[in-house]
Every structure is written in C-alpha cells, then in structure tokens.
Amino acid sequence: MVITEMTPRNTIAAIATAIVPQQGSVGIVRMSGSEAMKIAQTLFHAPGKQVWETHHILYGYIRHPHTGQLVDETLLLIMKAPRSYTREDVVEFHCHGGIIAIQQVLQLCIEAGAELAQPGEFTLRAFLNGRLDLTQAESIAELVGSQSPAAAQVALAGLQGKLASPIRHLRACCLDILAEIEARIDFEEDLPPLDESEISQKLDDILVDLSMVLATASRGELLRTGLKVAIIGRPNVGKSSLLNAWSHSDRAIVTDLPGTTRDVVESQLVVGGIPVQVLDTAGIRETEDRVEKIGVERSCQAAESADIVLLTIDAQVGWTELDEVIYQQVKHRFLILIINKVDQVDLVHSELIRSIFYPETIKNVVATAAINNQGIEELEAAILNAVNLDNVQPENLDFAVNQRQAAALTRAKIALEQCLNTIKNNLPLDFWTIDLRGSIYALGEVTGEDVTESVLDIIFSRFCIGK
C-alpha cells in the first residue's frame, strides 16, 4: 500500500469479517469516508419511519440501485464522525453469512463510488485522524493475531496506551533537556552555564527507564510467535505417549512396535501463556525401510528448526549407545532431557539413572510417566525457565514491545549513550543537541509522532483487509 497523502479524502469499503470455507451466520461490509452515508442511502431501503441517526441500527433491504433487484435483508449500523473507529462517517451492512451476499453488497458499494480498502486502511485512518497512536494501531493487529490469553492481554494493554505512556514520558524528558541546551546556545550571555553532572544524571535516568522498556522485547516476541518444541529420541521411548498426555488428546498413534511414528505429528499448546508448537517425531535409528528413513530425516530436521529439543529416553533401559548418538547430533541445541517411564522402575533405579546414565553436561532433566500424566507440570516449568519466562501470566503483564518498536528504542538508547560520551569528552553544546535530537526522533517513531510514510506503509500492509 502506497500512502500518497496524509489526509484521506476518498470513501473506502471492505468486507470486515473473515472469509472462510465454513459459512458464518453474519457477514459485515464496512465503509468509511465522507460519502459513506450517501452510498448507504442509495443502496439501503429501511421500511417504516426509521430514523437515520448516528449510533442507531436500521433494519431493511439492500437493492440494486438501477434494477431494484433484492440483494439481501440486512441491518445497517450508522456511526457518524467523529464518534467512529476512523473518526470519519462509518456505516456497516450486517448481512447474512455466506460469501455471495457480502461480495454482492461490497460490489454495489464500489459501483456507487467507494474504493476497495487496502490492508489496514481503516486503522490507518484512525491513526491519521488522531484516534489512535502507532502503538495502539499495532496492538490492534496483535490482538487480532494473538494465539494465547497472555498475548491478547499484552495487546490490550498496548491498545489502552500502557506502552505509549512511558515512551511519551521519556521523549518529553529528552525534549526538556534539549530545550535547556538550546537556550544556553541562543542566550549564552543571559543564562548561567549548564550543570553537566545534572544533565548527565538525567540522561542516565532516562537510559535506565528505556532499558526496562526494551527488556520486554524478548517476552513480546515469544508471546507473538511462540516456541517450537521437538520431541526426539530412539523408537519406543514414549515420545508419542508424551505428546498425547501433554496435549490431552490422541494426536499420535501409540503401539509397542518400533517405527510406528513415521512422520512429524504437530500439536498446538499454550504453556504459561506462550503458544507452543509441539512436534512428535519418528524414532531415530538405522533402518532400511524407505518410508521410515524419510521419517528419521524429518526428525533431524525438526530438531534443527526447534527452539527447544526434548531428548527422550526410557528409564527402564537407561542411557544407550543410540541415545549417545542422538545426543551428539542435537547437543548444540537447547536441550531438556526427558526420562520417561519412571513409573516402571523403582526409586533406587531412578536415582541411578539420574546419576550415571546420561552426560553431566545435560543440566535440564525432567522425569515423566507419560501414561499417567506424571511430570507434565515439571516439563512445562522447565520450558518456561529455559526462556526465562517462568511466570508469564496475564496478571503479571503490562506491555511488551514488538520488533519494530525495539529497533527504534535501541536507536534511541544508542543516541543517548552517544550524548553522554559527547558531554564526557567536553564537546560543544551543538554536538549534544545532535544526539538528543536523534533520540527524540527515534522515540517519536515508536508512537508515531515522528514517522515516515514508508514506515506506515510497512506497518499497515500487515493488517487484514477490512481492519
């Protein structure tokens, strides 16, 4: 999407509900712009004495404006500017579900003068018209795409301005310091000299707060993209049973025959608020079976692509030569050792396994009995601990910055550090202002106070059409 002007004048239309193979009960066509009401009045016929007032719902029919042919029986929602999502006149046709009806309604809107909306254009208008800042706009996209309650909670926090608030405060502090410096440059003879130690302390305080905001980036990335976890090991150690116990389902086939799992079986879970894609893989061993050999290759590929590898062994057998071979293949990955089937051995045997049956270099070890659901909580705790997120719950979250925001905040941090070095090296005040301006601009990029059209283009093109 190319933004040619910063003040939209055309009227846009799009289908606002998801288009899926399964038909929903309702489909919505949304319009926004100065001509939205006029187009709606051309297409929509409300029987009786219904009043076309803002924030009212009308009942009626959509007919072709030239032929009078009935298209659908609908509800019409009216939201006049500025009390709308975009702060423009907005109307929504609530049609019967099914792609044919809503596509026909959309086509009539376009024929009547509306333009097909680009991805994210409704939210872009909300931003350009001052209803949302850029962090709030991005939070809407993140809320729509959230895969867990914790991710949704973080997105809602951003939508409520909890991320923008500290960023604006830091930017205001930088602007205050810049004003002090520029006043000394312009009115050097009329004002006392700057206290360099005081300015440096203020910059240090800003850097501390900025670093705290930046520290949420890794948490935010995990909440948005999740983790990929691969369960690997030799045949018949209970990998599929572990997946089934963990996912509370029968996703994987379980038998006593080696080589039952011949392909990667996936399951989507949420662990401590983090979306987790779990991959149950074929048992790794030397085999002449062509199909099983392909499965073994895919197991190795899954281990390479995973964020965390669960190397699973059998407590009844202990650490075998094949376990050692597999370990050597995956030891460069982040590894958690799963000692499965501990319910089949006595306590003494279990302690022996813990002490001598696996390399001392494996520090993360969890004992499980998948068939009895034993050890699942400990496994989840080990995974969260592995990514330093052992308490990511909605009640413990305020906000988390995304990748774009983190990049801008990093630029702001670097500029502030350069400003401190400039002061330390006794360079002229003009040099101080260069670094400070760089930091102020970078902070403004986060909230949208200083942002280029190309950046807006990238951000809003990631939205769905109709949002």
UniProtKB/Swiss-Prot annotation:
Keyword Magnesium: yes
HAMAP family: GTPase_MnmE
Assembly and interaction partners: Homodimer. Heterotetramer of two MnmE and two MnmG subunits.
Protein's name according to its UniProt entry: tRNA modification GTPase MnmE
EC class of the enzyme, as a word: hydrolase
Species assigned in the record: Trichodesmium erythraeum (strain IMS101)
Protein's job: Exhibits a very high intrinsic GTPase hydrolysis rate. Involved in the addition of a carboxymethylaminomethyl (cmnm) group at the wobble position (U34) of certain tRNAs, forming tRNA-cmnm(5)s(2)U34.
One GO BP annotation of this record: tRNA wobble uridine modification
EC number annotated for this UniProt entry: 3.6.-.-
Cofactor: K(+)
Entry binding sites for Mg(2+): 240, 261
Binding locations of (6S)-5-formyl-5,6,7,8-tetrahydrofolate: 30, 92, 131, 467
Coiled-coil ranges from the UniProt annotation: none
Alphabetized CDD domains for the sequence: trmE, TrmE_N
Gene field: mnmE
Cofactor note: Binds 1 potassium ion per subunit.
GO molecular-function term, one example from the UniProt record: GTPase activity
Domain of life: Bacteria
Keywords: Cytoplasm, GTP-binding, Hydrolase, Magnesium, Metal-binding, Nucleotide-binding, Potassium, tRNA processing
